[in-house]
Amino acid sequence: MKNILKLSIAEMHDNLKKREFSAVELTKLHIEAVNNEKLNAFITKTPEIALSAAEKADYIFTHQKENLTPLTGIPVGIKDLFCTKHVRTTACSNILKNFTPQYDSTVTKRLLDNGAVMLGKLNMDEFAMGSSNSNSCFGHVKNPWVRADGVEVVPGGSSGGSSAAVAGFLCAGALGSDTGGSVRQPAALCGIVGLKPTYGRCSRFGMIAFASSLDQAGVLTRTVEDASLMLQSICGYDIQDSTSANIAVPKFSESITHTIKGKRIGIPKEYELSGKYQEYTEVSEMWAKGIQYLKDEGAEIIEISLPHTSYALPVYYIICSAEASSNLARYDGIRYGARISSDDINEMYELTRGHNFGTEVKRRILIGAYVLSSGYYDAYYNKAQRIRHLVINDFVESFKKIDYILTPTTPKEAFAINEQLDTLTMYLNDVFTVPASLAGLPAISVPIGLSKSNLPLSLQVIGNYYDEGGILNVASIIEKHTGKILK
């Protein structure tokens, strides 16, 4: 048998059913890997909780087989944005460094109720704001992939700990969150699968808020099939979340038919950047390869236009910053968060928020406060919301004549950890993922190959609302042609 840690979730499940190894043995191997990791992916480790869950899983495998699920006994990691009962949850911010919730987030509870084994909490950009996982009070995360010249690179963000842990074989799958690309972009840079479901498909209860109209839980796995299994366990209506969609959840794995003959694939001309920027040529070549794969399988390729794409990124950063400034107002050291004491209440607020929030979080709070201020609300926030509707309408009109959209996930490969990028260049990492987030559409990132620097490149499949099964199927075709790039 190949290295047990490198098995997919589906393969682990099959071997557990055959009793080739026990859930406890599987968990102990993962605990050892987590304890010896050099990626800084796990910030809180829960070996006792994991072993207890594994023992329960083994009992189910031997005595209660009727209660088995595809995730029973499977070791997973949880992004530190999701509340975990009696386990520290910090959003990787100093202001929450000692916060221990008294309840689980809905998606965490559903994952654990399905028998998954929690190995611990995963590193991330502070409050999910970032695309490199360098904005964490616990330090940056390393990508398991190293550039051909030996340079270490970022894992992407904000779910960088999740993507690095899965790609580094520290856990079989991980929970992440996606606001503007925070599941898909790190998955792309680490060469794994990352899926953001339709907004409302998964509950946000117990998920520390960044931008409430955009935040959505997602999954990161090493295969498309595994993504369908993890997603199945966390979806569903939740009365505790007013934005949760009360809509039936299909069996996603049954949608993976490995056939797309006759399906119409839209190729948006606005996503082609190689003519403007030479460094994007390699990504465009991989995009063309993916298009050919789908064409060879009988799909119809149709060029489409999403005319307001160029506005998506600035609109996103106005809206998400506005919502962040509102959501993070509660962390004042009195109601929530660590406090730096002072005899003067205004000075206490200033010290508490000034010292406990990181640079990127403070930047977005300031931008958000500015665009929501009385003199600029109409000029910025209100206008951004109007343009958001135009972006949504572009997708609505396109899906009248196509079934899926295929794009690159990121404009280029992962950059070096020590590379100093200006803020605008950093924000451009999300240029291909943000439009689907603004529209609330489901989207999946799947590896397409390696760059000349031996780093992963990926493609994104966007589907219509609640068609997670469909995008999983299209992604499976690309996966079939590409094969696993993780060794």
UniProtKB/Swiss-Prot annotation:
Its EC number(s): 6.3.5.7
BP GO annotations: translation
PROSITE patterns reported in the protein's UniProt record: AMIDASES (PS00571)
Complex and partners: Heterotrimer of A, B and C subunits.
Family classification: Belongs to the amidase family. GatA subfamily.
Physiological role: Allows the formation of correctly charged Gln-tRNA(Gln) through the transamidation of misacylated Glu-tRNA(Gln) in organisms which lack glutaminyl-tRNA synthetase. The reaction takes place in the presence of glutamine and ATP through an activated gamma-phospho-Glu-tRNA(Gln).
Protein name: Glutamyl-tRNA(Gln) amidotransferase subunit A
Organism: Ehrlichia chaffeensis (strain ATCC CRL-10679 / Arkansas)
